[in-house]
Amino acid sequence: MAEKFISDNGAKVHDRIRISTDAKTYEGFLLPRHNFSGEDIVVLKLDNGYNIGVSVEDAELAILSKAKKDKVEFTKKKKNKELKDITVLATGGTIASFVDYKTGAVSPAITAEQLVNSVSALDKVANIDAEPLFSLASEDMAPKHWEGIAKKAKEIHDKKQHGIVIGHGTDTMAYSAAALSFQLPEISNPVIFTGAQRSPDRPSSDAHLNLVGAAKAAMTDLGEIAIAMHQTTDDENVALWRGTRVRKAHSSRRDAFMSPNEGPLGLVKENVELKGKYRPTAKETKMESGFEDSIGMVWSHPGLGIGDWESITSRKKGVVIAGTGLGHVKSELLESIGKTAKDMPVAITTQCLSGSTNLNVYRNGRELLQKGVVETYDMLPETALVKMMWLSKHRADEVRELMGENLIGEISNSRKLG
C-alpha cells in the first residue's frame, strides 16, 4: 500500500516531500521502508533529525525537491600549526554506525574519516589523522583484536608521537581497555577509548561530545589507558575512567560507565581536569602483546553444579570465578574447585558492583584459600579475566602469585585480613 502510494506520486527515496493528512502535515526526506514497516507506513527524516512513520491512508503527497545524486566527498583539512596532532583509530561500534533503514537496525558503516569529519568541533581541538583498523560490532571483538589495537598504538607512538583516540563499541569496551592496559603498561602519549550509546546520525547522539572529550584527553600527560564517556545524561561533561577499573553499568543510557570503589580519573569540560593519582606519560611506549585464549570465567549461582564446573574447566588453562558477595561459591563445589586449583590457576572476584572479596570471613572462603584459590579483592570480573589471559601468556609461572597483586591499578583495595 505504501509502496504503491509512493510510486503513484512519483517519489523516490531521499526526495524531500510533504505528506498531508486530515490531522497534520509533515515535511522531510523520504527514507527507505525497513523490513518491519507496516504496509501503510512511509518513513520520513524530519528537519529536527528524528524519523517518523506516517500512514498513507487518506494522505496526499507533494514532492518539494528531488534527491541530490552528488557524491559527498571530504576534503583534506589544512593543518593548524597552533594545535597538537592526534590519531583517531576506528574499530567499529555504535560511534561508527548509522541506522540501516532497510532493517531499522544500527549497522557499523562509517569510516574513520567520515566519523572525524562529522564532528566539526574537532577542528578547534586538534589536527586529526583518521585511520581505520576494524569495522566490528563490540560483541565481535576478540583477544586477537586487542593485540592488533596495541600493536597499532605502539606503532603510532613510535612514529608520530601522537595521542590516540580509539572509537570502540561500548558493550565490550571495558574488556578492551583492560587488555590494552596490561599490554601497554607504559605509554609515551595518552590512549583514550570512546564510543557512543546512540549512533551519530541521531540528534540525541552522545558521539560528538564523547569524541571531543576523548580528543582533549589525548593531549594531556595521562600515561594510562582510559575510557572517555558521558558522566551524566546531559551534555555537560565527559568522565575519564581508568582502563582497569571501569565497567559498563547501563545498557542504553549515555552515562553508562562507572568505576566501582573509586571515582573518575578526571573530567573534561572546556578543559581537562585530571584528579587524584595517575601515572604520567613515559619516555617511550612499552608493549607485551598477546593473550592465552583458553581461560574460563564461571559465575557462581544457585544452580551451578559439579558437572557444570567440570564441563567448563576441563579444557581451560585457568579459571576466574565471579563469586557472590565476599567471594562465595556453593559448599558442594569446594572439592572440585580444589582439584582444579592443583592443575591450573583459579582466582575469585565478586559479582557485586561495589565492595571487595574477603575470603577470611566465612568458612567456605577460608577453604577456598586453603585449596589455593587466589583472592583478587575488588578487581572487576572483566579485568580479572583479561589479567589472567595476559599473565598466562607472559608470566605463566607466576599467575598464582600475581593475580592478587596490584600491577597497574586494577586493584584499589588490596587489604589482606586474617
What are the residue ranges of the model-derived segments?
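ATP/NTP phosphate-donor binding region
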Residues: K4-F5, N51-G53, E60-K154
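Conserved RNA-binding domains used in RNP assembly and mRNA/RNA metabolism
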Residues: M1-K81
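Interaction/scaffold regions that mediate signaling and macromolecular assembly across diverse proteins
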Residues: A130, T357-A396
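Short Gly/Thr/Asp-enriched flexible loops that form oxyanion-binding sites at enzyme active sites
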Residues: I166-V191, V329-I337
